[in-house]
């Protein structure tokens, strides 16, 4: 069972994907999990920047540019969740 943070991030990414791509993804929006590859949702580097911006706003975190470069290695939803979790832990 996914925790609250995971569900919130999946929901945020789901909304972004739906707004950007409509229903034109290879994964049904209701089937997004932590294993879902970002590319299967049509999220490229620009889309990832949008995701990061939305997550900054949602959680009040700041993603430094040098950190954002490291985030280019994010491959799936679970990677995004763990990266955000790490930043939230630092904020406390």
UniProtKB/Swiss-Prot annotation:
It comes from the Bacteria. The keyword Phosphoprotein applies. Residues 4-88 form the Carrier domain. SUPFAM superfamilies: ACP-like. Keywords: Nodulation, Phosphopantetheine, Phosphoprotein, Plasmid. The keyword Transport does not apply. The modification O-(pantetheine 4'-phosphoryl)serine is found at residue 45. Pfam families: PP-binding. Coiled coil: none annotated. Signal peptide: none annotated. 4'-phosphopantetheine is transferred from CoA to a specific serine of apo-NodF. Proposed to synthesize nod factor fatty acyl chain. Involved in trans-2,trans-4,trans-6,cis-11-octadecatetraenoic acid biosynthesis. This is Nodulation protein F. It comes from Rhizobium leguminosarum bv. viciae.
